[in-house]
């Protein structure tokens, strides 16, 4: 596309219309606006002169000259105001990631279109947006960006930044970027053409390939207020411009106000970063040392594991070889021993077989006898049980007999009582009937007279009845009482007679009962007989009863005697059997007691001799065993000591190799250690002296390395505080030749501070807290300072200075001048050379000290672990001597065992014979008793008789005892008993008749008064009737009582009779059972005496014991036979096995000998036998050695995984059939390590010594770097102090900023201020850092974490409620090292009656928000300038410009306030406003977009403000 356009279609470059709207309006078309430079502390602030837009939509080549205060763009919608501002912003921040012109894209969108609103503002082809600036140095700089649309759907724009310097002020920017090709045509130059054009006019053109370089240039030349190092800085700057452009309070800025207002403390942060970097580097070096140490440990590990791997296998093979030889010898011994045992077992088999046959025969005989004894015992037990039942039944029968007699008497008494009660009851009934008859008679009388008459008649009837009964014809009322007394006396006499007869009758009955009882007892014993023969029979029985009783009492003695005789007979039979057995076993024929006693004496003497020999043998054997046990204990003790002694010998040998000495005694070791301590102390003193010297040199180097030459860092702070410069900094470029002069010229004041005004500084001196003891201040201009302030005269060796009228100072030229950087650098070079020499000497001596310390450590370990054993005798030599002695003792013990075995066999035989004799000798008298059988028969006959009497007494003893006291009653039979009984009956009958007569007479006597009623005796009829009634009632009550008594006596008689019947029935049944039991015991045919059971049991137990003993012996013999037979098979197998094992072991020994010879040859030829033959391993088991070898093999596989040669060698060595390959691997490892030794550093060929020297050197380096790390470390308290000072400084700065905001007013807002506070959580962190809490020091003393991580962990510890998210501790710690994170910033406004409020858009009107937001932005820009002042040139004050779009939202008063603010703060402002805005000050451009045909352009007219003055 052609870059040529018709000028008439775009803009008239030379004849723009000028409209004069006021007399004071001045035409400004195509003429630069008069520009005035304001000063800032004597330095003029840079200004933006103009904005040039080339080939933008509506602007082909338009330059907007910018007012020094306010430039207003006025026009309607679409006039191009936003496009103009967009060109300014694009030239200022050419970053497509940030540019976003929202009012030309989607409203309310955060993303916008893909071109960010820029693509549509450009015309096709090359476009430019250029800013023309003039900085504080009066340099004209044109900075801009070349824009070009990129064809495609994405509507992308390509940007390239550039700058132009050296262009004259008269040169119009438009003419630079265009070329006139005709009278009314011009062409836009591309970038290369522009570059050529600029170079042709003698200016400088520079293109930038990064936005950072572009902004760096703009900062250095004073165009932007802040160095934009990163995208974050550019984003902040763009957000500030955007907030200014669209007005209001930007939440993006207020939310992160700290990042905008508070400067980043780069110095402190860099110091922390440098410190942590140095610590990190130091720790990396330490880690590298650890890696080297791990390599050294790897080599050491390789040597150790290789030695364990090969030496354990070497010693295991040696132990196995020795074990195989011993096993072969042991197998041969077992082979011979098994053959001997086989011969012995065959002899035992024959003997035991013969004994087993004898025991079987004897056992059969004993089984028959035992079964007979068991049967006999069962019969005896049955007889005893029957006898017990018989005895029990006899006792029961005797008891029942007594009870029957007693019960019979009780029944007879009850019967008599019952009959008497019945008679009394009948008599009472008769009397009741008589009384009732009288009452009936009385009742028949109708009145009392009749009653009396009746009574009289009854009395007459009673009198007649009495006469009749008594046979008294002369009985009358007068003599009735006499007769009554007479008959009553007769009745009493008859009663006495009856009682006498009853007494006689009872006596007769007793005699009759005794006779009957005795007769029954006699019949029970002797059977039925006449009553007359009972006395003779009873007499005969009682005569024989005492002898039978005595004979029965002698039955137990007879039984005992018989039992003793039978036992004696059994003993006799047993003794005969023992004698036969003894003769059979001893092959003798001893019969008499004398022969047996003589043989017994001989055996006792033989036993004593054999026992004495055995005792001597046992004592000798015990002595030998004790000696052998002592030797074994000594051997075990030496075996336990041997590994430690061998280890001690190896350690001693290593010490001798390391020290080059030979030690014969422990005292030699102690003396050598003492001498080494003296040498170590001397070298340590030399090392410490060199260390002190090196520290001094480091301190001098550090002091001289200060960039300004100040030796005290406090001077820098004071110079900054006073606004001065250090004198040493002014003379920093002094040559080496002039350095001595100036050093002597200023003398002690060579470290003075040059200030502009001493009076201003003098006021601050009283407030100084931390300063040097002597502080020199010199008044002068730091930019033009010379030595004219002093009056001096140079001499040959020094300088004389006139201090005052009365004071001179003479200073000699220093030998080593330090005034000026050249002198310091020369001195630094000398000090560094000297320091290197001292460091080298220190390193060498430190190495020697480490070497001596390591050697002393080895000696100390040796003294603590091995000194007690190292110089003792060789335990293995002692063990071999002990083994030889033990073998001798074992041979002697074997001989003793053989002899003892023979003696014990003889002793056992003699004891066996003596035991049999001891059983026989006590029974010699039994053997001599020949009439024993006759005595047994005689005793048995006596016992039979006694048992018969005992049985008779047992059966009839109770009966005879009952018969004995009443036997005399049998002498006379009581026959007159019946006559006496008849006489008693007659007497009782007479008594009854007399009593009836007495009763009749008594009735008459009672009725005697009735005889007086013969005529009219009727008065007492009623009384008599009443008496009769009472009499009747009494008689009835008596009758009831007697009836009850009769009933009771009948019941009692029935109960007694029932008991009698039960007793009689029980007596009959038991008597029958007793007879049956007597018959059964007779059928058993055994005697059931007291000792029968015991004798039967003893007999059975004896036979059972003999049978059990015989069976046990037979079982034992059979087991022994089975065992011998099985042992015979086992012995045959054992003989074959031991023979086979012996041959196998012998073959193994022969086969292993070849491989072992190869191993020995390799180890001896390579001088490795001493390392492999570790005797202490010989005392470990094969499993332990194999486990050691396997563990070492696993470690070696890992260790040599990266070494192909060693890996292959190790793989070959794993073949257990070829142990020589392990030795070859051992040699290969040592050869590999020898090749790795650096001979220029380590002067040894032994890898172990090389590792030792490496360890010493690495320990020295580790100690040195650890000390350096301690120096680099920073304390938490110092960090807290730095943070507090920085925060205090920034708080003061914010306070100063607030002073500039006090008079700002927009609408109801009367003032604006910033509120800064320290966060509570971070205040706690500062307190914890500066406090004395020891619980937090563990974090800062931990070398495993950085200081930043320690800060983060401390923050988390004191604020556990805060969620840190996914951020690392290092990230959090770095944030905590930034003081800005400790502060909270808020903007407050003073609005009307509400007072101070938080500045938020919702609480303010639009104009108030715009004004407040502009105030905040001005504060941010001012803060940025202050922040960057230290890193910007001192002669540069940056440009200051802000934007405001849609200014119609501000009222006129606010616009005036804004203009006043710009004037007071020396700030330029670019405003876009509708056409109705016409500010009184500044410059206004009226923009009108015109369309001609298919093309459009913006018509621009510039106006000077109404209030402007020349």
UniProtKB/Swiss-Prot annotation:
The keyword DNA damage is annotated on this UniProt entry: no
Coiled-coil annotation: which residues? Answer: 6-30, 346-506, 553-611, 673-706, 821-846, 876-1064, 1094-1149, 1249-1304
Any one Pfam family match given in the protein's UniProt record, by short name? MukB
InterPro entries, alphabetically? MukB, MukB/SMC, MukB_hinge, MukB_hinge_sf, MukB_N_dom, P-loop_NTPase
Q: Cell division among the record's keywords?
A: yes
* Residues annotated to bind ATP: 75-82
The biological processes this protein is annotated with in GO are: cell division; chromosome condensation; chromosome segregation; DNA replication
This protein's GO cellular component annotations are:
cytoplasm; nucleoid
What GO MF annotations does this protein's record show?
A: ATP binding; DNA binding
Chain intervals for the UniProt region annotation (Flexible hinge): 707-824
Location in the cell: Cytoplasm, Nucleoid
Gene3D superfamilies the record matches: 1.20.58.850, 3.40.1140.10, Immunoglobulin FC, subunit C, MukB, hinge domain
State the SUPFAM superfamilies in the record. Answer: P-loop containing nucleoside triphosphate hydrolases (SSF52540)
Alphabetically ordered keywords of this record: ATP-binding, Cell cycle, Cell division, Chromosome partition, Coiled coil, Cytoplasm, DNA condensation, DNA-binding, Nucleotide-binding
Family assignment?
A: Belongs to the SMC family. MukB subfamily.
What does the record note on quaternary structure?
Homodimerization via its hinge domain. Binds to DNA via its C-terminal region. Interacts, and probably forms a ternary complex, with MukE and MukF via its C-terminal region. The complex formation is stimulated by calcium or magnesium. Interacts with tubulin-related protein FtsZ.
Q: What exactly does this protein do?
A: Plays a central role in chromosome condensation, segregation and cell cycle progression. Functions as a homodimer, which is essential for chromosome partition. Involved in negative DNA supercoiling in vivo, and by this means organize and compact chromosomes. May achieve or facilitate chromosome segregation by condensation DNA from both sides of a centrally located replisome during cell division.
Q: What is known of its domains?
A: The hinge domain, which separates the large intramolecular coiled coil regions, allows the homodimerization, forming a V-shaped homodimer.
Q: What is this protein called?
A: Chromosome partition protein MukB
> What is the organism of origin for this protein?
Haemophilus influenzae (strain PittGG)
**What gene, per UniProt, encodes this protein?**
mukB
């Amino acid at each position: 596309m052609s870059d040529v356009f018709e000028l008439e279609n775009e803009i008239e470059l030379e004849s723009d219309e000028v409209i004069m709207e006021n007399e004071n309006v001045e035409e400004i078309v195509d003429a630069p606006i008069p520009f005035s430079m304001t000063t800032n502390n004597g330095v003029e602030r840079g200004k933006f002169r103009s904005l040039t837009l080339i080939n933008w939509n509506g602007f082909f080549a338009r330059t907007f000259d910018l007012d020094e205060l306010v430039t207003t763009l006025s026009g309607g919608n679409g006039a191009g105001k936003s496009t103009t501002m967009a060109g300014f912003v694009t030239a200022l921040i050419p970053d497509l990631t940030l540019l976003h012109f929202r009012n030309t894209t989607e409203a309310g969108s955060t993303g916008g279109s893909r071109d960010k609103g820029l693509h549509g503002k450009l015309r096709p082809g090359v476009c430019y947006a250029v800013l023309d600036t003039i900085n504080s140095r009066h340099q004209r700089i044109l900075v801009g960006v070349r824009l070009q649309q990129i064809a495609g759907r994405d509507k992308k724009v390509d940007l390239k930044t550039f700058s132009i310097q050296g262009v004259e002020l008269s040169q119009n920017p438009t003419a630079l970027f265009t070329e006139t090709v005709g009278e009314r045509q011009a062409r836009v130059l591309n970038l290369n053409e522009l570059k050529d054009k600029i170079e042709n006019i003698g200016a400088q053109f520079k293109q930038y390939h990064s936005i950072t370089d572009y902004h760096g240039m703009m900062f250095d030349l004073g165009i932007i207020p802040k160095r934009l190092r990163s995208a974050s800085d550019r984003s902040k700057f763009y957000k500030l411009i955007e907030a200014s452009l669209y007005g209001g309070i930007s939440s993006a800025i207020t939310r992160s106000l700290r990042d905008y207002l508070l400067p980043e403390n780069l110095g402190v942060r860099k110091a922390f970063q440098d410190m942590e970097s140095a610590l990190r580097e130091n720790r990396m070096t330490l880690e590298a040392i650890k890696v080297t140490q791990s390599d050294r440990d790897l080599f050491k590990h390789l040597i150790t594991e290789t030695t364990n791997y090969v030496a354990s296998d070497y010693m295991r093979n040696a132990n196995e070889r020795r074990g195989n030889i011993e096993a072969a010898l042991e197998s041969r011994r077992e082979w011979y021993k098994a053959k001997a045992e086989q011969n012995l077992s065959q002899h035992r088999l024959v003997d035991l077989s013969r004994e087993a046959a004898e025991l079987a025969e004897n056992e059969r005989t004993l089984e028959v006898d035992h079964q007979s004894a068991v049967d006999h015992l069962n019969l005896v037990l049955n007889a005893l049980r029957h006898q017990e039942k018989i005895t029990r039944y006899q006792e029961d029968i005797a008891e029942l007999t007594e009870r029957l007699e007693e019960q019979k008497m009780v029944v007879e008494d009850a019967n008599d009582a019952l009959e008497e009660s019945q008679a009394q009851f009948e008599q009472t009934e008769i009397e009741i009937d008589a009384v009732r008859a009288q009452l009936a008679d009385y009742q028949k009388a109708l009145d009392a007279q009749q009653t009396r008459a009746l009574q009289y008649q009854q009395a007459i009837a009673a009198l007649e009845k009495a006469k009749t009964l008594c046979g008294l014809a002369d009985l009358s009322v007068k003599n009735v009482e006499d007769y009554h007394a007479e008959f009553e006396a007769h009745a009493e006499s008859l009663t006495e007679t009856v009682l006498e007869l009853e007494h006689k009758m009872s006596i007769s009955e007793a005699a009759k009962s005794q006779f009957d009882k005795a007769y029954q007892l006699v019949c029970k014993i002797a059977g039925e007989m006449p009553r007359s023969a009972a006395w003779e029979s009873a007499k005969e029985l009682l005569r024989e009863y005492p002898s039978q009783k005595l004979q029965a009492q002698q039955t137990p003695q007879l039984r005992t005697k018989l039992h003793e005789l039978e036992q004696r007979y059994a003993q006799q039979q047993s003794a005969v059997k023992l004698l036969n057995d003894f003769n059979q076993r001893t092959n003798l024929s001893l019969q008499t007691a004398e022969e047996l006693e003589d043989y017994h004496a001989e055996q006792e003497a033989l036993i004593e001799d054999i026992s004495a020999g055995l005792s001597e043998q046992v004592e000798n054997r015990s002595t030998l065993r004790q000696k052998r046990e002592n030797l074994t204990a000594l051997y075990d003790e030496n075996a336990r000591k041997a590994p430690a002694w061998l280890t001690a010998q190896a350690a001693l040998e290593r010490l001798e190799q390391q020290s080059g000495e030979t030690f014969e005694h422990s005292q030699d070791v102690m003396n050598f250690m003492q001498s080494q301590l003296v040498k170590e102390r001397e070298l340590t003193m030399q090392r410490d002296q060199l260390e002190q010297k090196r520290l001094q040199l480091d301190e001098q180097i550090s002091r001289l390395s200060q960039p300004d030459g100040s030796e005290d860092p406090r001077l820098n702070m004071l110079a900054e505080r006073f606004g001065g410069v250090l004198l040493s900094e002014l003379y920093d470029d002094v040559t080496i030749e002039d350095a001595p002069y100036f050093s002597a010229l200023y003398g002690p004041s060579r470290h003075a501070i040059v200030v502009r005004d001493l009076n201003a500084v003098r006021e601050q001196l009283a407030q100084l807290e931390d300063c040097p003891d002597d502080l020199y201040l010199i008044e002068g201009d730091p930019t033009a300072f010379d030595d004219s302030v002093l009056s001096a005269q140079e001499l040959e060796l020094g300088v004389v200075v006139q201090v005052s009228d009365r004071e001179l100072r003479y200073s000699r030229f220093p030998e080593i001048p330090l005034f000026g950087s050249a002198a310091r650098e020369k001195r630094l070079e000398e000090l560094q050379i000297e320091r290197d020499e001292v460091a080298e000497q220190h390193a060498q001596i430190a190495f020697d000290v480490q070497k001596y310390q390591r050697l002393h450590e080895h000696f100390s370990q040796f003294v603590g672990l091995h000194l007690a054993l190292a110089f003792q005798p060789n335990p293995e030599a002692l063990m071999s001597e002990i083994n030889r002695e033990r073998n001798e003792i074992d041979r002697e013990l074997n001989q003793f065992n053989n002899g003892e075995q023979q003696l014990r066999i003889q002793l056992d035989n003699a004891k066996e014979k003596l035991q049999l004799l001891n059983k026989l000798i006590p029974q010699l008298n039994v053997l001599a008793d020949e009439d024993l059988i006759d005595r047994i028969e005689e005793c048995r006959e006596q016992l039979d008789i006694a048992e018969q009497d005992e049985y008779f007494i047992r059966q009839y003893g109770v009966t005879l005892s009952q018969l004995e006291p009443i036997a005399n009653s049998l002498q006379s039979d009581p026959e007159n008993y019946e006559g006496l009984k008849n006489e008693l009956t007659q007497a009782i009958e007479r008594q009854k008749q007399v009593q009836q007569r007495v009763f009749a007479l008594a009735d008459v006597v009672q009725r005697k008064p009735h005889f007086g009623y013969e005529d009219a005796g009727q008065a007492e009829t009623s009384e008599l009737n009443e008496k009769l009634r009472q009499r009747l009632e009494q008689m009835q009550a008596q009758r009831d009582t007697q009836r009850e008594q009769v009933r009771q006596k009948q019941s009692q008689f029935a109960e007694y009779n029932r008991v009698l019947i039960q007793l009689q029935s029980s007596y009959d049944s038991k008597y029958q059972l007793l007879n049956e039991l007597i018959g059964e015991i007779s059928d058993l045919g055994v005697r059931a005496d007291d000792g029968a059971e015991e004798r039967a049991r003893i007999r059975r137990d004896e036979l059972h014991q003999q049978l059990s003993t015989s069976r046990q012996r037979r079982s034992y013999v059979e087991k022994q036979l089975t065992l011998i037979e099985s042992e015979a098979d086992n012995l045959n197998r054992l003989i074959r096995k031991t023979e086979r094992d012996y041959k196998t072991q012998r073959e193994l020994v022969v086969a292993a000998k070849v491989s072992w010879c190869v191993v020995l040859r390799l180890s001896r030829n390579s001088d490795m036998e001493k390392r492999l033959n570790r005797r202490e391993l010989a005392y470990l088991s094969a499993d332990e050695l194999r486990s050691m070898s396997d563990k070492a093999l696993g470690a070696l596989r890992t260790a040599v995984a990266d070494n192909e040669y060693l890996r292959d060698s190790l793989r070959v060595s794993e073949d257990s059939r070829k142990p020589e390959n392990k030795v070859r691997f051992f040699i290969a490892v040592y050869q590999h390590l020898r090749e790795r030794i650096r001979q220029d550093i380590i002067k040894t060929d032994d890898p172990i010594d090389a590792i030792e020297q490496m360890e010493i050197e690495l320990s020295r380096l580790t100690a040195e770097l650890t000390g350096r790390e301690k120096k680099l470390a920073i304390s938490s308290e110092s960090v807290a102090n730095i943070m507090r000072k920085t925060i205090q400084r920034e708080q003061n700065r914010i306070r100063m900023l607030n002073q500039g905001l006090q008079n700002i007013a927009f609408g109801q807002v009367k003032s604006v201020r910033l509120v800064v506070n320290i966060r509570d959580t971070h205040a706690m962190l500062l307190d914890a850092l500066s406090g004395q809490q020891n619980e937090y020091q563990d974090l800062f003393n931990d070398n495993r974490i950085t200081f930043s991580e320690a800060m983060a962990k401390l923050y988390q510890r004191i604020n556990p409620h805060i969620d840190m998210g996914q951020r690392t501790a290092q990230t959090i710690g770095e944030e905590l090292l930034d003081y800005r994170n400790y502060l909270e910033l808020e903007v407050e406004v003073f609005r009307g009656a509400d007072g101070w409020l938080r500045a938020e858009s919702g609480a303010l009107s639009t104009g108030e928000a715009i004004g407040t937001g502009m105030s905040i932005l001005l504060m941010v820009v001012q803060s940025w300038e202050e922040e960057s002042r230290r890193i910007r040139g001192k002669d540069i004050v940056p440009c200051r410009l802000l934007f405001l779009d849609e200014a119609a939202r501000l009222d006129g008063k606010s616009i005036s306030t804004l203009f006043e603010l710009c004037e007071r703060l020396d700030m330029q402002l670019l405003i876009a406003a509708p056409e109705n805005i016409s500010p009184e000050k500044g410059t206004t451009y009226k923009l009108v977009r015109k369309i001609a045909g298919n093309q459009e352009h913006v018509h621009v007219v510039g106006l000077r403000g109404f209030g402007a003055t020349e």
